[in-house]
């Protein structure tokens, strides 16, 4: 209050009429009332000024402070948690003033406003009332009945203040407040509830929503039907609706198991009369129909662990972990739908098409599937959205169907004349919906199907689809080619095993990896292809060979005609020479462990020390040039021979080798980050492979940096016409000198001499500085 207002107060109170009315009007807006002021107090302007000075801006009251302060405190406690009846209010101590009667003046009722309870407190109270009421036992009910003999409580029950009924409240009852559920509430709280019922109604609705959410999880805590009948309660379900998963914005009931036998009851004569038609609308009749079950009934064992799979492009649902008192569900799983396009397949056995499931499928060679999920679209009984063999068993493939497997079926658009029969190999589990007239899914069926042969139903699926807990664990289950774990993805040609750049330049397409479809013998026998294919073609698609022996070797490996067994046909030695392009083994053969492709460990093979053709001898540990394409201009590959052996199946001479990588074969092209490579520089690697000796073009030499420098100096000396050195200044040592067959002859073409200074890690695509 401003200073001007204070100065005007004496002037207003000094008038002849109504001396105290303005002051009392102002005081009534901020104090409890003015009738408590003592009548003998002088009403002078000084007294009014002092009274304004002590107004409760500083929380100070008038002379009768103690009674008024205690009275306000007791009023608050009485409105929040006061006595249960009027008789208890009379039993208060005599030294304390009595609370104001409910028949006080309208002025006091308008002034005294009780403190509103917080919504959190109301929520907790309403929720506790609903939950604690469900946990009441017969002994607790008896205790409350015996406690009802109190005269005060009997009078309160007669007036309808609260009720001891254990019947669970409906939504309409909850809307009026939780007064009928909580005996702790005061009977005089009805007036306050009539004045402001919104918080309690909101709390009751919140409690009802919490009860809905916890209804399925708290099923073990629900009293049995026998106890309900003993307590005189109704056995009809009290929850009018059940939360349901939505498919494309439409409600669909969840499939549940029966309370007694584990299976829901079917329509009339489901198995006895298969020709009877499915009713167009689920019945809402009295409970005397033995074959139908209301969808709102709470069953004892719901299909909680495995919710139905929402088909039609919807993601799968994860089952919740087990809770105390429930049957432990299957491990936490997650099903994923495949992303590859669905092939056109024959229709699956559908309800209403008895010819499709006239009998069990045969063929025990495949593992039986547990069940399948069926989705009926809006175009009739056809597989919508997902057609390729929708056999989705829960967990791993097993011949025993899981108990919680289910089928989500939505034949809402099925005409009434289409019969919905029970397949002969499955037991029905289904439930019907309430709102069949709405545009939603009206029927949910659970058809556990045990198929022993997928091809019988699907007409031969081109894809394997074993869906497990982790979905598609690897691409190998979809029959996609993958390199084996023991053999890394090498830059070799996919069909021939020769190296190609793992990451080619930008203008060159990325080559394909070696596929398991190609046979190892064909890979080993064929000639290497070009490492840099022409523009517009992929190296992985090249199948042409550089020599004619490849076609002959492929024809030789084909299975012989049944009229001429292979053992009776003679095998001339000249044919082996053609197969090996003229290379023949030299020396005696011996058994030796050599590297063989697709073998985890070195295999014992009949080995040789050298091969010979037209007087040229190539030994083990020599370096050779291998053909890379049909054209002579194709750059050959460089490899070092580690073993020469004979293939026991075809008798062909094979060689195990280690690849040398050219600069254009490296990852990133011909410009590695370490240094600028020389013209004839190659990079050693630990990339092992096998190939036929028929791909050998000629012998070459790979030298160290010092040896290559000496070779270049000698070549320059010979080019200048200087005489070569005839005698050595230092006699060579037999232990440390290069063997004569590995020394570079003086008349060797410089194009056949290579320099190797570094090792290339083909797995990581980098050059090793310090190879170990």
From Swiss-Prot:
The Swiss-Prot or TrEMBL record annotates one GO molecular function as: chromatin binding
PTM comment: Ubiquitinated in a FBXO11-dependent manner; leading to degradation.
Residue ranges annotated as compositionally biased, kind Pro residues, are 280-289, 340-352
Q: Where in the cell is it found?
A: Nucleus; Chromosome
Which keywords belong to this entry? Chromatin regulator, Chromosome, Nucleus, Phosphoprotein, Repressor, Transcription, Transcription regulation, Ubl conjugation
Region annotated Disordered sits at 1-63, 77-117, 131-357, 521-582, 723-743
Q: What is known of its domains?
A: The BAH domain is required for localization at H3K27me3.
Q: What is its main location?
A: nucleus
The terms describing its cellular component in GO are:
chromatin silencing complex; chromosome
Where Phosphoserine occurs, the residues are: 8, 101, 121, 182, 204
Reported function: Heterochromatin protein that acts as a transcription repressor and has the ability to promote the formation of large heterochromatic domains. May act by recruiting heterochromatin proteins such as CBX5 (HP1 alpha), HDAC5 and MBD1. Represses IGF2 expression by binding to its CpG-rich P3 promoter and recruiting heterochromatin proteins.
Q: Where is the composition biased (Basic residues)?
A: 49-61, 549-580
The PTM Phosphothreonine maps to 580
Residue ranges with Basic and acidic residues bias: 147-158, 170-182, 189-199
All copies of the BAH domain together span 616-771
Q: Where is the composition biased (Low complexity)?
A: 299-310
Q: From start to end residue, where is composition biased (Polar residues)?
A: 536-548
* Gene name per UniProt: Bahd1
Subunit structure, per the record?
Interacts with CBX5 (HP1 alpha), HDAC5, MBD1 and SP1.
The family database entries (InterPro entries) matched by this protein are listed as: BAH_dom, BAH_domain-containing, BAH_sf
Listed name of the protein: Bromo adjacent homology domain-containing 1 protein
Say if the entry is tagged with keyword Transcription. Answer: yes
